[in-house]
């Protein structure tokens, strides 16, 4: 497959630093090479880090994004840098998960979008947040939710 149509990407293949905050981050997208074909894309970030806005203590999550693209796909380096910009941000788990969903929704206009934040326990309580929009096409499947063991590939 020829590599063309990616000239609008400004971060992939170039030196790019982590933005100071998520509002400054740009989530880049590129043309879906298979428009009209329903398929599910999963992005998993096992090391999302934020700061508790009250205590200043770090919070950690596995972020799972499932989407069925229409015309655009997420460029993964820009998404990684976007997520890195949360490292020093004071935010609650629910707000962070919903904000990531909004930014992806604005960037993609996906047929289906689900963002799941599986937050590590704090004070003995885990918080799992799910924000979902659109209908999953009947010919698409979702992998089970859960933390994947990246060494074995098992959930």
From Swiss-Prot:
Catalytic reaction equation(s): 7-aminomethyl-7-carbaguanine + 2 NADP(+) = 7-cyano-7-deazaguanine + 2 NADPH + 3 H(+)
Matches recorded under Pfam families: QueF
Assigned EC number: 1.7.1.13
Keywords: Cytoplasm, NADP, Oxidoreductase, Queuosine biosynthesis
Localization per Swiss-Prot or TrEMBL: Cytoplasm
Active-site residues, as the UniProt record annotates them: 52 (thioimide intermediate), 59 (proton donor)
Binding site for substrate: 74-76, 93-94
GO biological process, one term: queuosine biosynthetic process
Gene3D superfamilies found in the cross-reference section: 3.30.1130.10
Superkingdom to which the source organism belongs: Bacteria
Top enzyme class: oxidoreductase
Pathway: tRNA modification; tRNA-queuosine biosynthesis
Family annotation (InterPro entries): GTP-CH-I_C/QueF, NADPH_dep_7-cyano-7-deazaG_red, QueF, QueF_type1
Main location, first listed in the record: cytoplasm
Molecular function (Gene Ontology), one example: preQ1 synthase activity
Record's GO cellular component terms: cytoplasm
Protein task: Catalyzes the NADPH-dependent reduction of 7-cyano-7-deazaguanine (preQ0) to 7-aminomethyl-7-deazaguanine (preQ1).
Similarity comment text for this entry: Belongs to the GTP cyclohydrolase I family. QueF type 1 subfamily.
Protein name: NADPH-dependent 7-cyano-7-deazaguanine reductase
């Amino acid at each position: 497959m020829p590599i063309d149509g990616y000239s609008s990407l400004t971060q992939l293949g170039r030196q790019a630093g982590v933005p100071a905050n998520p509002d400054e981050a740009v989530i880049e997208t590129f043309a879906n090479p298979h428009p009209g074909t329903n398929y599910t894309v999963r992005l998993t970030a096992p090391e999302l880090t934020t700061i508790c806005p009250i205590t200043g203590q770090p919070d950690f999550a596995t972020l799972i994004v499932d989407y069925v693209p229409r015309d655009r796909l997420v460029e993964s380096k820009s998404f990684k840098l976007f997520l890195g910009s949360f490292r020093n941000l004071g935010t609650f788990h629910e707000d962070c998960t919903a904000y990531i969903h909004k930014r992806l929704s604005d960037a993609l206009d996906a047929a289906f979008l689900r963002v799941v934040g599986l937050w590590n326990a704090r004070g003995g309580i885990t918080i799992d947040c799910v924000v979902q929009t659109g209908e999953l096409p009947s010919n698409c499947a979702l992998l089970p939710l859960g933390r994947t063991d990246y060494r074995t590939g098992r959930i």
